[in-house]
Design a protein with these regions (language model features):
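N-terminal Rossmann NAD(P)H-binding glycine-rich loop of SDR-like oxidoreductase domains
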Residues: 7-27
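NAD(P)H-binding glycine-rich loop region in Rossmannoid oxidoreductase-like domains
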Residues: 40-45, 50-93, 97, 121
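Glycine-rich NAD(P)-binding loop of the Rossmann-fold in SDR/ketoreductase-type enzymes
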Residues: 86-97, 136, 140, 144-145, ...
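Conserved Rossmann-fold NAD(P)-dependent oxidoreductase catalytic core, especially the SDR/UDP-sugar
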Residues: 96-141, 163
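Flexible, glycine-rich beta-alpha linker
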Residues: 122, 163-180
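Active-site Tyr-X1-5-Lys
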Residues: 139-163
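Substrate-positioning beta->alpha
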Residues: 148, 175-180, 194-216, 223-227
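Mid/C-terminal beta-alpha module of Rossmann-like enzyme folds, strongest
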Residues: 218-258
């Protein structure tokens, strides 16, 4: 459904956004990318992507090329901010502006994918799983702002072909936070924050991109939220042990209170 289509990716220069751009181009799409004035574009080929400098933190930002778009992938988001208001401006309020413009001027749009986060749901009880109908109880400003963004997306899904994707920890080339964890192990340290045995889900970035492209398919049901994982449950100690085995290093555990 993507060959010959035109797609917009917000946060196109980011870890997930840049991988999505690569796959859209490989699928035969014309791609427009929203980036900030200060964005590092090292993972984007400016000769293949129509780049637009747009600051989603500004309340009056304008979405370019809306009349041409078949698909919109909203990947832009703020994972670190100085205040609660900073998170909410980009992760929630900006969604309202984006989808309002899509509603008014995006008459060709066949699919919108809103990239949220497992943080919008909040942590699961130890030993338990969460699913799409589990009540959301985010515990951080980031998670609360992502949930607010989801709620805005849900309102617009009444009139727009919109789906929400909630990834867990995403890993792969170009990622920095998970890579920092691995680099510490390479140096002989396993950083353990809080209690031992913390469970988590993972997804490889190319698998997440595949799920996002599938969710954009016009034949798929819209107005829904989806968790996407690799289907396994991990604990951090298990991941650290496997990383240490692959790199053939001995590690010491450094415990930090949560």
């Amino acid at each position: 459904h993507l060959k010959g289509a035109t797609a917009l990716v917000t946060g196109a220069n980011g870890f997930i956004g840049s991988h999505l751009v690569d796959q859209l181009l490989a699928s035969g799409c014309t791609v427009h990318g929203l980036v900030r004035e200060s964005s590092n574009l090292k993972w984007l080929d400016a000769s293949k992507v129509h780049l637009h400098r747009v600051d989603l933190a500004q309340p009056d930002f304008i979405v370019p090329a809306l009349e041409e778009l078949d698909y919109v992938f909203h990947c832009a988001g703020l994972t670190k901010a100085k205040s609660r208001a900073g998170y909410f401006q980009v992760n929630a309020t900006a969604c309202s502006n984006l989808y309002e413009q899509c509603q008014k001027n995006g008459s060709r749009i066949k699919g919108i994918v809103h990239l949220s986060s497992l943080a919008a749901t909040g942590p699961s009880p130890q030993g338990s799983l969460v699913d799409e109908i589990t009540p959301c109880k985010p515990v951080t400003f980031y998670g609360q702002s992502k949930l607010a963004g989801e709620e805005i997306a849900s309102q617009y899904s009444q009139s727009l072909p919109l789906s929400v994707i909630r990834p867990p920890v995403v890993y792969g080339p170009r990622e920095e936070n998970f890579f920092t964890f691995i680099k510490l192990i390479q140096k002989g340290w396993e950083l353990q924050i809080g209690r031992a045995g913390k469970e988590l889900s993972l997804i490889y970035v190319s698998d997440l991109v595949e799920a996002m492209l599938a969710a954009s398919d016009p034949s798929k049901q819209k107005g829904r939220s989806y968790f996407v994982t690799d289907g396994h449950v991990y604990v951090w100690e298990q991941i650290a042990k496997e990383c240490a085995r692959i790199m053939n290093v001995q590690v010491k555990t450094l415990r930090v209170p949560e």
